[in-house]
Amino acid sequence: MIFQYRTNNLNIMKRQISAAIGLVCLLFAAACSSDSNSPYGTYVNPVLAGDYPDPSIVRDGEDYYMTHSSFDYNPGLVVWHSRDLVNWEPISYALQEYLGSVWAPDISMRDGKFYIYFTVHGRGNFVVYADSPYGPWSEPHDLHVGQIDPCIAVAEDGTKWLFLSGGQRIRLTEDGLDTVPGTLEKVYAGWPIPEDWITEGLALEGPKVRKIGPWWYFIAAEGGTAGPPTSHMVAIARSKSVDGPWEDSPYNPLVHTYSRDDRWWSRGHGSLIDTPDGRWYIVYHSYENGYYNLGRQTLLEPVELGEDGWFHPLGKNIVEGELPAPLPLQSYDRKSRLGEFRIGLDWKYYKDFDASRASVQNGTLTLKAAGQSPADAAPLLFVAGDHAYEFEVEIDRDPTASAGLVLYYNSTYYIGEGIGPRGTMRFRRDKGGVRQRMQDVTHIWLRLRNDRQVVSAYYSLDGKEWHKDDWGIEVSGYNHNVFHEFQSLLPGLVAIGEGEVKFSNFKYRTLDSE
């Protein structure tokens, strides 16, 4: 058994005083070096707006690859590519089938292959691999170990370890595709959170263990991923060996929300990443104050690796303003291709799905109808990430099918507008109503508007003259702290009943949210 190194209270106080002095110097240096005259311009957070939780990142030369928890959305584990750490493009997805709720992946690269270790809630931990981040990806391999949030670390002698939640680790087989029975052990107790901080508890999760220079670093998520605004954080410890003992940083936490007045709440679950010239950043997730139902968004923040061998934060709230771009910026509008209906890259189903239901040709999505309501029809969804937006689509439905637009949290909580054999309808849990009008209409345009949490619906018979429907709803409560499940409120399309529905001329617009 390996135990964490603990200092006494006096040593802790000395380290904290020393850390405070060092931090003042670092902040002064950062202020001088982080002006808006960066040769690459500036960026603002989030770098991925909307529900992109538990980011894990790896660098291959000048290319960066990142993935996130996919939870109950499928296809799962979308892999993103960037060359500037700010603009990201989806390039593949690692999971072809629904395994369950997929949590906290860890993407890594070794021996010319890419690996993603991940948790399936209630089933354990798995791994997939590929020769290229563009895929194709292997079938999932069961690692035969419980816990959550796996992360691989390869020791100097080639021994492979899988670090897990609760400060535990287990040895992996030589190929990294299974675990060695009887080797599970607890190696780290976590950074002790101050008693007066308001969190969800210790919740020692999201380990990222890697060697940088002479040190091994244990980056951990603590405090709980949701709950109060000040819950989450990133703590860090180090050791001369992957076997420990682990010494907590005097600068902890590296990332944290200190006030409910901050823009970004529950900041945590971070991964360190460097640039080719040796500058360091951390990617992590956070809820946005006032827009909790957007989910946990991906943020990027510079950090400093000091001469003392510790990673230092450069300020408590630098993430809220403009920051110098790490690298030459390359623009990419991830919503510009929504009209192509790229399922798996831009669009995803909720839970299980039958891929044969969907076909795309010349910008028209043909979707076979299924289920009795949005609850069991596996709606096709996308991430918006904006405070105010609207989306619309032209619909041609078979007389036996219903079709519509939704804002979807899960199979119990959703809102939307549709049309079917009985006329126009409002989707809302089991309380949706049929308007008993336009029963014979099979060709229609529908629009949903989400203007800073207030949702309204519109329809048109010619795509030019629009009519507002007679309902509206406020949706800020559609979030994890109310409904659980770690989901977000996603816009999308649904086809219900029997027959087919054709969706075409899809349009998405960001509205002025000021």
Per-region residue spans from a language model:
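Bacterial N-terminal signal peptides that target proteins for export
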Residues: 8-21
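Intrinsic disorder/low-complexity segments
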Residues: 15, 30-33
